[in-house]
Curated annotation (Swiss-Prot):
Keywords: Peroxisome, Stress response. The gene is HSP16.0. This is 16.0 kDa heat shock protein, peroxisomal. Belongs to the small heat shock protein (HSP20) family. GO terms for biological process: protein complex oligomerization; protein folding; response to heat; response to hydrogen peroxide; response to salt stress. It is found in: Peroxisome. One of its GO terms (molecular function) is unfolded protein binding. May form oligomeric structures. It comes from the Eukaryota. The keyword Signal does not apply. Gene3D superfamilies: 2.60.40.790. A motif (Microbody targeting signal) lies at residues 144-146. GO terms for cellular component: peroxisome. Induction: By heat shock.
Length: 146
């Protein structure tokens, strides 16, 4: 009896996502690690399945690092076109998109930022400005007119 009520279409309503993915926000946030070394800030962002052409990294408003990514959807569209006579029950693997903004510290070299993708991880290296040289202490001779 319980299987009659909780099975079939009701199972998806009770145990599935509360909203279809299209109703959720247009972009998700990708998981990120941010470490600081003596010479740079290193950000590692999970981008599974994405290549260098699928990710966009830029600096906006002076020091806001923006990372956006979207999986190519051409392969998924071709797959759906080939399967015209099938019935889709769930389609959650669509075109995942994400966006992430990070306010960078003021003491960084924005023009030297590097980014690379390897094994589903985007690594962004933001070099630091070198610390200003501390002036050496030097004695100053004091003169007198007497």
């Amino acid at each position: 009896m319980a299987d009659l009520f909780f099975g079939g279409p009701f199972r998806r309503i009770l145990y599935g996502r509360p909203f279809p993915p299209d109703w959720a926000s247009a972009s998700a946030t990708a998981a990120m690690d941010w470490v600081e070394t003596p010479t740079s800030h290193v950000l590692r962002i999970n981008v599974p399945g994405l290549g260098k052409d699928d990710v966009k990294v830029q600096v906006e408003d002076g020091n806001v690092l923006t990372v956006r990514g979207a999986a190519p959807h051409a392969a998924a569209e071709k797959e759906r076109e080939r399967e015209k006579d099938v019935v889709w029950h769930v389609a959650e693997r669509g075109r995942p998109e994400f966006a992430r903004e990070v306010a960078l510290p003021a003491e960084v070299r924005v023009e030297q930022i590097r980014a690379s993708v390897d094994n589903g991880v985007l690594t962004v290296v933001v070099p630091k400005e070198p610390a200003p040289a501390r002036p050496r202490t030097r004695p100053i001779a004091v003169s007198s007119k007497l």
